[in-house]
Swiss-Prot record:
It holds the Pfam family adh_short. Pathway: Lipid metabolism; sphingolipid metabolism. It is found in: Endoplasmic reticulum membrane. NADPH binds at residues 67, 69, 71, 92, 96, 123-124. A motif (GXSXG) lies at residues 67-71. It is a single-pass membrane protein. PANTHER family: 3-KETODIHYDROSPHINGOSINE REDUCTASE (PTHR43550:SF3). This is 3-ketodihydrosphingosine reductase TSC10.
């Protein structure tokens, strides 16, 4: 209900008018200092009011990992097993799954009697396969933690790929995550547990979801879709006591990383600069350590955290008192950086005319036509 201003008590009216007058007389510097001070105090109040996060304890819990036969998924499987989890790894290739399970059980003793690690072979780009993984027949008890790690990057220029290759990239990176997480979260929601023990769904996207890079066009688009999935599911899962975590790794050593480097355009290497890839094991340790601290938007290096500040959106912040001012700075700096990148790209294609000439003639690339 809205009251006419004449009905507001005189003292209140006088106070409001005084406040407006004070704002009008305040200098721009003083005004923005006041606003910034208010925001800082408000953020500190939110931090103090936030309940203390519980440590993620997976001993005796069921952890299901897609892409668990190699790369970060395999490293997470080994790490979780050493922490006492009952691990299930999921991938398509049975031979790789068997080798990974054998490697882990040979290398590590069980943390407790009866601890298990097993595999399920499934093509997660198919909805029915993802549903089978989490069915009661395949998995009698629901998972406590899910890691969605499956994915692959195929480098090159978008115009050089056939439509079938573009669709394959989206299927490999987005649909596999969507179907796997949808089936797993649905199973979790069906069988709720105590609010004191939240379940976890950690979904791997990429730092390139924040800042697309020439030569990774189709990969960036699919990983940006995964980032939107993370933000959407994070809110939808709240009523079921499921904590959704987004993981945005930079480069890490894996079979996939070696493959993507084989077709990476030279201009992409120039823009990237010297980027040291961490090991898959180090990536897994960083991700798990951040989850233990309650992190919901996890990056694996400083560059990733900086790039995240360009695309904060409605996602949870990481070290927000530092990240918000950084975001303001990056809004100013990014156009300058883009100007230098665009200059380098024009110089590259001026010197390498085959790509432009081919497409001006209406040619569509072969399986890997991108100039090196």
């Amino acid at each position: 209900m809205i009251f006419p201003i004449s009905e507001i008590p005189d003292k209140v009216t006088h106070s409001i008018l005084e406040g407006v007058s004070a704002l009008q007389n305040m200098s721009h510097t003083a005004f923005w200092s006041t606003v910034l001070g208010f925001l800082v105090v408000a953020r500190i109040a939110v931090i103090l009011a936030t309940p203390k996060r519980r440590v993620l304890d997976i001993k005796g819990k069921k952890v299901v990992i897609s892409g668990g036969s190699q790369g970060a998924g395999a490293a997470l499987a080994e790490l979780c097993y050493t922490k006492g989890a009952n691990v299930v790894i999921v991938s398509r290739t049975v031979s790789k799954l068997e080798a990974q399970v054998q490697k882990i059980v040979t290398k590590h003793e069980p943390v407790f009697e009866g601890q298990t690690i097993r595999y399920i072979s499934a093509d997660l780009t198919k909805e029915e396969e993802a549903i089978r993984v989490f069915s009661e027949e395949t998995m009698p008890a629901p998972p406590d933690v899910i890691f969605s790690c499956a994915g692959a990057a195929e480098t090159g220029f978008i115009l050089d790929f056939k439509a079938s290759q573009l669709a394959r990239a989206f299927s490999t990176n987005y649909l596999s995550a969507l179907f796997f997480v949808h089936a797993g979260t649905t199973r979790m929601a069906k069988e709720p547990i105590s609010p004191k023990n939240p379940r976890y769904v950690a979904i791997f996207s990429s730092v390139l979801a924040f800042y697309p890079l020439l030569g990774y066009g189709q990969y960036c688009a699919s990983k940006a879709a995964v980032r939107s999935l993370i933000d959407s599911l994070r809110v939808e899962a709240l009523p079921f006591n499921i904590r959704v975590v987004g993981v945005f790794p930079g480069n890490f050593q894996s079979e996939g990383f070696e493959e993507e480097n084989k077709s990476k355009p030279e201009i992409t290497r120039q823009i990237e600069g010297p980027s040291q890839a961490i090991s898959a094991e180090e990536c897994a340790k960083i991700v798990f350590a951040q989850m233990e601290k309650g992190g919901q938007m996890i990056t694996t290096d400083l560059i990733g955290w900086i790039l995240q500040s360009i695309a904060l959106s409605s996602s949870p912040r990481s070290f927000s008192l530092l990240q918000i001012p950084l975001a303001i700075f990056m809004c100013i700096f990014s156009p300058v950086w883009n100007a230098f990148v665009n200059r380098d790209v024009r110089k590259y294609f001026h010197a390498n005319t085959e790509y432009v000439t081919r497409h001006q003639r209406g040619g569509v690339g072969s399986e890997n036509p991108t100039p090196q």
